[in-house]
């Protein structure tokens, strides 16, 4: 098929691109840092502190969160057998955001590390609850895409209204924290944040990669997958749980960053095909590259100020989503 490339070549290209982007991103920002400057500077200098304790954790967190969002999106699209099944569009990210918002506006404060864990638990509970609702509605509607998207829109609206109530009752400090977090930002990246997020996201991504065969068989339909030896109910519940963990961990540390789970899997699928043995690792690398690029632009476009990275991904993903809908409509009419 035109435009297709060998999966191994694509994965190799994405890996090299990710390394280049990571090295470039670590040196870019309000203060430009080159490796030559760092080499000629004492390790006690402020430049080393900026690079080691601010830039590097943020770059690595962008890679980890990008992997989580893209792998989660790939799993959801495979689970629902539709390329429009994105965690953000279906309201899963909104559910996670609502639970974290409830924790932010609690009348008592928590120690930083305990607060991070509570955010992750809340985001996981919210994403799992909405995922279960969406999955149930999908079964009731026999997989009808229109009903699924309408359900996602309704859930997004309900969660958005609840978030609005939380915003209204929050004080100034809570409002500032919640507003920045709800637009998506990696500005709070620290080594402790990276360690906690990585300890959840990386093992879950590996477990997701191990589900590639089940995802491939589920594309044939539930009955066919069952005849080929797949316990369909357990496989779907397992995939739903993995996706909820990934979304919960990502939302807890970075806020709501949309459209990566929609755009990246579709782009990778167009290049290497729908075999999840290659699609899942390709999406992980592609998601890391895209979020790292968006975060670098967020730090540099209006330096020394900073844009929420979620705004940039939405500016990219919104038009792409409209194009995808029009493209599917043309394919049906053709």
Curated annotation (Swiss-Prot):
Q: Which CDD domains match?
A: TM_ABC_iron-siderophores_like
Q: Where are the transmembrane segments?
A: 9-29, 60-80, 96-116, 117-137, 149-169, 191-211, 244-264, 278-298, 306-326
Q: Which GO terms describe its cellular component?
A: plasma membrane
Q: Indicate how the chain sits in the lipid bilayer.
A: Multi-pass membrane protein
Keywords attached to this Swiss-Prot or TrEMBL record, sorted alphabetically, are: Cell inner membrane, Cell membrane, Ion transport, Iron, Iron transport, Membrane, Transmembrane, Transmembrane helix, Transport
Question: Is Cell membrane among this UniProt entry's keywords?
Answer: yes
Major place of residence: membrane
Give GO terms for biological process: siderophore-dependent iron import into cell
Q: Give one Pfam family.
A: FecCD
Q: Write out the annotated subcellular location.
A: Cell inner membrane
Top-rank taxon of the source lineage equals Bacteria
GO MF terms, alphabetically ordered: transmembrane transporter activity
**Does this entry carry the keyword Iron?**
yes
The UniProt entry's sequence similarity note says: Belongs to the binding-protein-dependent transport system permease family. FecCD subfamily.
What the protein does comes down to: Part of the binding-protein-dependent transport system for hemin; probably responsible for the translocation of the substrate across the membrane.
* Official protein name in the record: Hemin transport system permease protein HmuU
What's the source species for this entry?
A: Yersinia pestis
- What gene codes for this chain? hmuU
């Amino acid at each position: 098929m035109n435009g297709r490339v060998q999966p191994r070549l694509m994965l190799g290209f994405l890996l090299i691109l990710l390394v280049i982007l990571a090295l470039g991103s670590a040196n870019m920002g309000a203060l430009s840092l080159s490796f030559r400057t760092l080499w000629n500077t004492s390790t006690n200098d402020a430049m080393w502190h900026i690079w080691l304790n601010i830039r590097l954790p943020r770059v690595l967190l962008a890679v980890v969160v990008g992997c989580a969002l893209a792998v989660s999106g790939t799993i959801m699209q495979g689970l629902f057998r539709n390329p429009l099944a994105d965690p953000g569009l279906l309201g899963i990210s909104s559910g996670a955001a609502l639970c974290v918002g409830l924790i932010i506006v609690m009348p008592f404060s928590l120690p930083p590390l305990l607060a991070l864990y509570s955010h992750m638990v809340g985001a996981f509970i919210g994403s799992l609850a909405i995922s279960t609702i969406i999955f149930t509605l999908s079964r009731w509607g026999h997989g009808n895409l229109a009903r699924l998207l309408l359900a996602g829109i309704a859930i997004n609206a309900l969660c958005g209204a609840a978030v609005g109530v939380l915003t209204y009752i929050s004080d100034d400090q809570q409002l500032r924290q919640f507003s920045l977090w709800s637009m998506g930002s990696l500005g709070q990246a620290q080594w402790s944040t990276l360690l906690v997020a990585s300890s959840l996201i990386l093992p879950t991504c590996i477990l997701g990669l191990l589900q590639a065969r089940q995802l491939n068989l589920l594309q044939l339909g539930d009955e066919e997958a069952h005849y080929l030896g797949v316990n369909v109910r357990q496989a779907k519940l397992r995939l739903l749980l993995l996706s909820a963990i990934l979304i919960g961990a990502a939302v807890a540390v970075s806020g709501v960053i949309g459209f990566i789970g929609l755009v990246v899997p579709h782009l990778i699928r167009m290049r290497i095909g729908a075999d999840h043995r290659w699609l899942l690792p390709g999406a992980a690398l592609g998601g890391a590259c895209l979020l790292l690029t968006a975060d670098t632009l967020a730090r540099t476009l209006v330096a020394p100020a900073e844009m929420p990275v979620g705004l940039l991904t939405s500016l990219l993903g919104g038009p792409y989503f409209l194009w995808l809908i029009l493209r599917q409509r043309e394919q049906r009419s053709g």
